[in-house]
Regions:
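Active-site-proximal cap/loop segments of hydrolase catalytic domains
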Residues: 1-148
Length: 148
């Protein structure tokens, strides 16, 4: 029994992999990216981030953005997934997690969304202690539910 988790780029890869294999019994996607089109120009990294990561923009080779978006493959996902996002994350916006969460629910996949108010992209490293504890509890409970 194997689970998968990742945050930020690892969250993107978690979203990606659940749409490409059913190998994992469960997943935890943290502060993730699901849609390169909607993410364009919204990150605090800078306007160049999408073009750098995908060699595409909404105006140039825009199909490539969709092909690289985990949301495109959400209809193939079967893995129960917990999404963890912070409301004040300006690197990987909450909407990215909500899109993937909603897509999984729409396609009948068990999913849970856990949002943290007053936290940002650094929740796991420098968030409020009570929120860091809750995050770890949510992850542990999810893995225990599906991996036992």
């Amino acid at each position: 029994r194997v689970g998968v988790t990742g945050g930020s780029y690892g969250g993107y890869m978690t979203n990606w992999i659940i749409g490409h294999t059913d190998r994992f019994r469960c997943a935890v996607s943290q502060r993730s990216i699901s849609n390169w089109i909607s993410k364009f120009g919204t990150t605090d990294i800078g306007y160049y981030f999408n073009a750098d990561q995908n060699q595409a923009t909404p105006w140039i080779n825009h199909d490539k953005l969709w092909w690289h978006s985990p949301l495109k493959y959400a209809d193939k996902a079967k893995t129960p997934t917990l999404f963890i996002h912070s409301e004040q994350d300006y690197r990987c916006w909450l909407a990215e997690g909500i899109q993937m969460f909603t897509a999984l629910k729409y396609h009948g996949v068990e999913a849970r969304l856990c949002m943290f108010r007053g936290e940002n992209h650094e929740l796991s490293r420098s968030g409020k202690p009570k929120h860091r504890l809750r995050r770890l509890t949510e992850i542990t409970n999810w893995f225990e539910k599906y991996l036992k």
